[in-house]
């Protein structure tokens, strides 16, 4: 409950400042006990955040679509490691995948300037 209260404070502050929030879910974890805890937390967060912000689930994204932890995926016959050996953190390739998923959701809009030039200024989430 305290954790969700903190999450809501962040979302409220963002709303007050007219800032859109993109929140990424929690991926599967290698260690079973930690994974069980994180699945519970991920569900709580998704239920709380989805109506108020853009929620990007990461569990299946980082596990090649399966319902279990995977540190690597096979892409066109090439093994790509997305997770570090600790089963928690991300490799550089995993970080890039997550960044790409965030960028897919951002819409860059141009606004006209007084001198006729356009400037990219506003961001909005899809």
Question: Where is each model-derived feature located?
Answer:
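Alpha-helical cap/lid subdomain in secreted, periplasmic
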Residues: 1-111
């Amino acid at each position: 409950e305290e954790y969700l209260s903190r999450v809501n404070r962040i979302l409220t502050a963002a709303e007050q400042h007219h800032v859109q929030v993109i929140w990424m879910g929690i991926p599967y974890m290698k260690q079973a006990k930690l994974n069980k805890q994180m699945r519970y937390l991920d569900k709580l967060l998704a239920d709380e955040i989805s109506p108020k912000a853009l929620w990007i689930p990461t569990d299946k994204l980082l596990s090649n679509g399966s319902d279990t932890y995977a540190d690597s995926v096979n892409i066109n016959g090439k093994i790509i490691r997305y997770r570090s050996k600790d089963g928690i953190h991300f490799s550089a390739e995993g970080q890039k995948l997550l960044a790409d998923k965030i960028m897919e959701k951002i819409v860059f809009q141009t606004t006209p300037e007084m001198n006729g030039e356009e400037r990219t200024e506003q961001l909005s989430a899809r």
